[in-house]
Amino acid sequence: MKNLIIIISLLIGSEICFGQEFINTDNFKSKVAKDIVVVEFYAGWNDANAAKYELTDCSYYLVDISQYMDLQMKYDITAIPTVIVFESGEEKIRFLPNVMFKLDADKKTVQKDIDELMLAKFN
């Protein structure tokens, strides 16, 4: 019963985080400080391999490392795309690309991890 209530509350309160927005050095810290936030680090020259997932129960932001190399260095981004899931400003999960610069984690995998973070709040 408890799980059913949690699932229903997640469905009712879920927000789809598509229409991703770009963040920069100036607003990065304030944006990731909010609840569950997904940040995709990518490069404009590799836009074809960008994930840009439409996920629920999170905010989704993009960082172009060719413009914000300080963020690339701070978060040790060595390959792109790299997707980091933050919870209240703290890195929780990191998804890395394969040798073809494509993200191995699909949308379903990333969403599952976000859902687990959400459910953990109720335990």
Can you describe what each PLM-predicted range is?
Residues L4-G13:
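Sec-dependent N-terminal signal peptides
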Residues E15-G19:
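Sec/Tat signal peptide C-region and signal peptidase I cleavage site
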Residues E21-D57:
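Local sequence-structure signature of Cys/Sec-based thiol-disulfide redox active-site neighborhoods
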Residues I65-D70:
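N-terminal post-signal-peptidase region of extra-cytosolic proteins
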Residues V85-N123:
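Non-catalytic, surface beta->alpha helical segment in thiol-disulfide oxidoreductase systems
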